[in-house]
């Protein structure tokens, strides 16, 4: 079949790769001049199935109120009247129950574990390299209360069969020797030996090169204007360079996905969650991390990428604003400075921001839609890199009529359709001219 993939971030490129490997004729279109130049450009770098957790969790509403008065809060809500934001936040708060958290985390871990396996197979098959390391990840706790609260996550990990190690202070330093100078700040940690790290931008670019060799066509600098519909199906993609037609369409445009389908009657509950990162050149390797260290206090990941350190995280609800907030840079620098002081100079770092496409329940939307020839691969939030290979393969299997290797019914748009049907919303409307 002829397939058009909208978006060339890591989700779009992995989708294109697996679709091409399944024998389809694939074209990818993106407004940028190359792959992974938006949200996939400088993310935190960790591939962490075990840490795949929804932001909607018990206790988060109370924590959010406390964070409002902290200078270095992990979550910031910029004041602005926005109905889409209000609706999304209300749905997120509704998922902050213990029962919802357990369900959401379990299915996120399912997809993330599968994705890591797919990535390993892809690496073995192609020899692709992207500053990857397979040395696990370590979540460090500065307070005993944080360590105690991790018990709920540990229960889910145990139920899902994910290997883990609960470490004391000395165990954390043994796993990450660079923490020796800051050991007094740590009370313990949770290590997941099966997790990985890698440069998402480097991976996406190299996979795009391989996809091109496999027959995929990439069209750069093409702005997508609208999806056109006729007879209950997508008939074309309208761009500033003309119309493209295909048998199937895959929407992988991250936070911008809802804008592409709203006029078709699809109400995607995806909202941008702004994140930040610093990329620091290593000056003292003995003080640098070996893999990824998650700072639970600031919700920051500190990742080793070759001869660089990527410090990424935080969450800012600010709509589609991409301006750089200097206070967020202070928070990232504070986290890495306190845990890995002297490893590099944060003042000379590359400061970046991107928009993560977040769903209220944390689980991405991967699969079919009520429109027969339109598929979604979006809403991965902070876990797009972690879930990319598995999501791309899942989309290819669904389009190709193959049974997926994992349960996928609860990963798609259908879980959000009950409310839409109750409200009497149409499943498909003609595209506006």
Swiss-Prot record:
Single GO biological process annotation from the record: D-alanine catabolic process
Catalytic activity: a D-alpha-amino acid + A + H2O = a 2-oxocarboxylate + AH2 + NH4(+)
Positions of disulphide bridges: none
Pathway(s) of this molecule: Amino-acid degradation; D-alanine degradation; NH(3) and pyruvate from D-alanine: step 1/1
Entry EC number(s): 1.4.99.-
Primary enzyme class: oxidoreductase
GO molecular function term, any single one: D-amino-acid dehydrogenase activity
Keywords annotated in UniProt: FAD, Flavoprotein, Oxidoreductase
UniProt keyword Flavoprotein, yes or no: yes
InterPro entries the record matches: DadA (IPR023080), FAD-dep_OxRdtase (IPR006076), FAD/NAD-bd_sf (IPR036188)
Gene3D superfamilies referenced in this protein's UniProt entry, alphabetically: D-Amino Acid Oxidase, subunit A, domain 2, FAD/NAD(P)-binding domain
Gene Ontology cellular component annotations, sorted alphabetically: cytoplasm; plasma membrane
Cofactor(s) the protein requires to work: FAD
Keyword Oxidoreductase: yes
Residues holding FAD: 3-17
Database matches in Pfam families: DAO (PF01266)
Function: Oxidative deamination of D-amino acids.
Family to which this protein belongs: Belongs to the DadA oxidoreductase family.
Protein name (Swiss-Prot/TrEMBL): D-amino acid dehydrogenase
Organism: Paracoccus denitrificans (strain Pd 1222)
Lineage of source species: Bacteria, Pseudomonadati, Pseudomonadota, Alphaproteobacteria, Rhodobacterales
């Amino acid at each position: 079949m002829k397939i058009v993939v909208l978006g060339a971030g890591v989700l779009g490129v992995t989708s294109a790769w697996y679709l091409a490997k399944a024998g389809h004729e694939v074209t990818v279109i993106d407004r940028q001049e190359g792959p992974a130049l938006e949200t996939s450009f400088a993310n935190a770098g960790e591939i962490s199935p075990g840490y795949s957790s929804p932001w909607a969790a018990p206790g988060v509403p109370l924590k959010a109120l406390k964070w409002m008065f902290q200078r270095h809060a992990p979550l910031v809500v910029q004041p602005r009247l926005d109905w889409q934001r209000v609706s999304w936040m209300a749905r997120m708060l509704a998922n902050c129950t213990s029962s919802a958290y357990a369900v959401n985390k379990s299915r996120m871990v399912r997809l993330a574990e599968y994705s890591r396996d797919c990535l390993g197979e892809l690496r073995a098959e192609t020899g692709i390299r992207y500053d990857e390391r397979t040395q696990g990840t370590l979540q460090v706790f500065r307070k005993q209360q944080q360590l105690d609260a991790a018990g709920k996550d540990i229960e889910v990990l145990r139920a899902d069969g994910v290997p883990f190690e609960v470490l004391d202070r000395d165990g954390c330093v043994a796993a990450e020797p660079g923490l020796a100078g800051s050991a007094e700040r740590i009370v313990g940690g949770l290590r997941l030996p099966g997790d990985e790290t890698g440069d998402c931008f480097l991976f996406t670019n190299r996979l795009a090169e391989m996809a091109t060799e496999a027959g995929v066509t990439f069209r750069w600098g093409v702005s997508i204007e609208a999806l056109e519909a006729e007879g209950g199906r997508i008939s074309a993609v309208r761009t500033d360079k003309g119309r493209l037609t295909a048998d199937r369409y895959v929407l992988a445009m991250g936070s911008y996905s809802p804008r592409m389908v709203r006029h078709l009657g699809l109400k995607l509950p995806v909202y941008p969650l702004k994140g930040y990162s610093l990329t620091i050149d290593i000056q003292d390797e003995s003080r640098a991390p070996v893999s990824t260290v998650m700072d639970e206090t600031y919700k920051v990941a500190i990742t080793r990428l070759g001869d660089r350190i990527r410090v990424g995280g935080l969450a800012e609800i600010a709509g589609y604003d991409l301006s750089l907030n200097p206070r967020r840079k202070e928070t990232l620098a504070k986290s890495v400075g306190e845990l890995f002081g002297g490893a590099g100079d944060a003042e000379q770092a590359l400061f970046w921001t991107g928009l993560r496409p977040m769903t209220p329940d944390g689980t991405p939307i991967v699969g079919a839609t009520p429109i027969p020839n339109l598929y979604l691969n979006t809403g991965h939030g902070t876990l797009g890199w972690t879930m990319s290979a598995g999501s791309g393969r899942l989309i290819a299997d669904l389009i190709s009529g193959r049974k997926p290797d994992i349960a996928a019914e609860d990963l798609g748009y259908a879980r959000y359709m009950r409310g839409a049907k109750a409200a009497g919303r149409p499943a498909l409307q003609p595209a506006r001219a």
